[in-house]
Amino acid sequence: MNSPANSSAARPAAGPKSVAAFQRASALMPGGVNSPARAFGAVGGTPLFIERAEGPYLYDIDGNRYIDYIGSWGPMILGHAHPEVINAITQAAAKGTSYGAPTEAESRLAEQIIEAVPSIEKVRLVNSGTEATMSALRVARGATGRKKVIKFAGNYHGHVDSLLVAAGSAAATLGAPDSPGVTPGAAEDTLVLSYNDVSGLQNAFAQHGDDIAALILEPVVGNMGCVLPTMEFLNAARDLTTKHGSILIFDEVMTGFRVAYGGAQERFGVTPDMTTLGKIVGGGMPLGAYGGRADIMNQVLPAGKVFQAGTLSGNPVAVAAGSATLRLLKENPPYEQLERLADRLADGLDRAATSAGMAHTVAKAGAMLTLFFNPEPVDCWAVADRCDREAFGRYFWGLIDEGIYMPCSQFEALFFSQQHTEAMIDETIAAAEKVLKSL
């Protein structure tokens, strides 16, 4: 759904103001951005610079409006600038933006998280999902006295040195799964396995079980596209970690409060020992959390000896946004609505791609979805890596010209908000059909 300024078929993919803004930013910041995927490296061209967002829409500085399927890469499940969240932020900021001291609001948010997430008995607030996963690994190693960690190719757990190995997200998109600056020593205790490979998991525990501190995974992968686990795989992860005394960590930074109020662990009925959270839990503000069994979390200083701290941890403005968001999700759960929208879009994209003769598959979980330019069902990174990246890039820019803003990478799931409607879904399907037929 385009604004009048967006209706001209002759306009370039990125408007002149975005082009100028990117040139300026590139002289000031590495690559012109503060997070790699935003540079549009996977699709080419100039990134769009955003002026504002409201409900399900983004507005760029050239005056174009887009139906937004990024949602700030996941947090905006209520839609952009929800009035009650903005009010909570405004009221909190008016009292002071940071105290460096405890507040009752932190306890209220902690209670909301503990009530919602099955695995969490105690929780620690931090500033990002990356910080949450980094801290959870340290706690797991401290609690077990072991060193080795299992992760899965294509799973992204933030820019943590020991986990930036065969990572998804921008690392996969840009062809740099192993970053310069990450020393061999930082990753030597990380075992990388194939997602959904039960036999590989069994073999790893047979060989290293007594040395494995933790197994960390995305219970629905969102950083090599939307990839679902098999129940056999999740149950094997749970059973093997229990048998060998290792800690099972679900990275629910993306899935937490999105695929169900209690996250993927509620959706699938598999309870980990620890959980990491981000995105929705902060209501669009910089906030993350990690938590789990009380005996594990009591290892964290000052209750225990594992050090973790942060100047802005429990920031009152971020806590207010997160608490308001979780309250609204509990009072008026959007999950059935989001499932219906996902079904509608998945079916429509499947029909459009089939009609266009495009080799594809569609995968979804709750309010997460990916159209893969690959005829094989994607269940691991080896299959995801065979997607047609060039076709995806043309598809992305075609949709931009139709006023639809999808993630700028084949390997990022798209997200819905409570503000999306069936009419918007139908408009998106019609745009996709037009673009796919032109590829």
From Swiss-Prot:
<dbReference type="GO" id="GO:0008483">
    <property type="term" value="F:transaminase activity"/>
</dbReference>
<dbReference type="GO" id="GO:0006782">
    <property type="term" value="P:protoporphyrinogen IX biosynthetic process"/>
</dbReference>
<keyword id="KW-0627">Porphyrin biosynthesis</keyword>
<dbReference type="InterPro" id="IPR015424">
    <property type="entry name" value="PyrdxlP-dep_Trfase"/>
</dbReference>
<dbReference type="GO" id="GO:0005737">
    <property type="term" value="C:cytoplasm"/>
</dbReference>
<keyword id="KW-0663">Pyridoxal phosphate</keyword>
<dbReference type="InterPro" id="IPR015422">
    <property type="entry name" value="PyrdxlP-dep_Trfase_small"/>
</dbReference>
<comment type="similarity">
    <text>Belongs to the class-III pyridoxal-phosphate-dependent aminotransferase family. HemL subfamily.</text>
</comment>
<dbReference type="Pfam" id="PF00202">
    <property type="entry name" value="Aminotran_3"/>
</dbReference>
<keyword id="KW-0413">Isomerase</keyword>
<feature type="modified residue" description="N6-(pyridoxal phosphate)lysine">
    <location>
        <position position="279"/>
    </location>
</feature>
<dbReference type="InterPro" id="IPR015421">
    <property type="entry name" value="PyrdxlP-dep_Trfase_major"/>
</dbReference>
<protein>
    <recommendedName>
        <fullName>Glutamate-1-semialdehyde 2,1-aminomutase</fullName>
        <ecNumber>5.4.3.8</ecNumber>
    </recommendedName>
</protein>
<dbReference type="GO" id="GO:0042286">
    <property type="term" value="F:glutamate-1-semialdehyde 2,1-aminomutase activity"/>
</dbReference>
<dbReference type="GO" id="GO:0030170">
    <property type="term" value="F:pyridoxal phosphate binding"/>
</dbReference>
<dbReference type="InterPro" id="IPR005814">
    <property type="entry name" value="Aminotrans_3"/>
</dbReference>
<comment type="pathway">
    <text>Porphyrin-containing compound metabolism; protoporphyrin-IX biosynthesis; 5-aminolevulinate from L-glutamyl-tRNA(Glu): step 2/2.</text>
</comment>
<dbReference type="InterPro" id="IPR049704">
    <property type="entry name" value="Aminotrans_3_PPA_site"/>
</dbReference>
<keyword id="KW-0963">Cytoplasm</keyword>
<dbReference type="InterPro" id="IPR004639">
    <property type="entry name" value="4pyrrol_synth_GluAld_NH2Trfase"/>
</dbReference>
<comment type="subunit">
    <text>Homodimer.</text>
</comment>
